[in-house]
């Protein structure tokens, strides 16, 4: 039986790409998104590319939605093994122009979603005695922001810490929790945040002189989702072209 992986914010962009890579690696995939029509469309495109696919509606700011999504997954597949907390809002508002409401809205999606995903779905994985959780952080959360807003960067930095906290919580119960911190990736979100006229300047500042490969991120998720990844937990995996080196 295939393992089952749920990806949040998977109706488009990187989330959809991650679903495709997981399918190609032999996982059954749950495409979850706040926009159910988008999740359904993505699931339809993925049909026939590997394992079984299920679309579910999931507002990642809602604990009740996570609980309902888990119930749907268990009813459909009978199990859940892997969680990819990918959903995020990207804002580029200048620091001194960010309103308290906008700050709360960004943190309320980017950080709250990881907390709820780890808490609700992680509790189920821990009870089952096995699981893999991968949280999408960002280079912006490590170096104080890049082309993104301070609220985005702060939320992504907090994900790195939250990853360690949940990794400690679940370590003895067969569940690993890791984060991936991408730099600029060749993705719709990056191209939307960086105007075409600024792209050459961005590339010039990346040591490898290129944007990152979205498929590689998906393949890294696959590796961290494997049973053999049991000895890797609480780590943040940097994929940034040399922009941030430990």
Regions found by a protein language model. Give the residues of each.
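Active-site helix of classical SDR
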Residues: 118, 155, 163
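Alpha-helical segment proximal to the catalytic Tyr-Lys
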Residues: 123, 164, 168-169
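Short C-terminal tail/terminal secondary-structure segment
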Residues: 143, 222, 233-246
């Amino acid at each position: 039986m295939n393992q089952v992986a749920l990806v949040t914010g998977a109706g488009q962009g990187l989330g959809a790409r991650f679903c495709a890579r997981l399918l190609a690696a032999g996982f059954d995939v749950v495409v979850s998104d706040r926009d159910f029509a988008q999740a359904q469309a993505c699931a339809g495109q993925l049909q026939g590319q590997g394992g079984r696919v299920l679309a579910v509606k999931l507002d990642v700011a809602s604990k009740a939605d996570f609980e309902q999504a888990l119930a749907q997954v268990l009813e459909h597949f009978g199990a859940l093994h892997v969680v990819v907390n990918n959903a995020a809002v990207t804002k580029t508002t200048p620091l001194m122009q960010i309103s308290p409401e906008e700050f709360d809205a960004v943190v309320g999606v980017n950080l709250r979603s990881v907390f709820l995903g780890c808490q609700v779905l992680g509790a189920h994985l821990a009870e089952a005695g096995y699981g893999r959780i991968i949280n999408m952080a960002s280079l912006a959360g490590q170096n104080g922001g890049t082309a993104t807003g301070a609220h985005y960067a702060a939320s992504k930095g907090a994900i790195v810490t939250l990853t360690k906290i949940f990794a400690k919580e679940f370590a003895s119960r067969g569940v690993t929790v890791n984060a991936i911190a991408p730099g600029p990736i060749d993705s719709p979100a990056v191209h939307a945040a960086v105007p075409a006229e600024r792209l050459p300047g961005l590339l010039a500042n990346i040591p490898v002189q290129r944007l990152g490969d979205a498929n590689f991120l998906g393949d890294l998720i696959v590796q961290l989702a494997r049973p053999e990844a049991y000895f890797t937990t609480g780590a943040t995996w940097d994929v940034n072209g040399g922009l941030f080196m430990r």
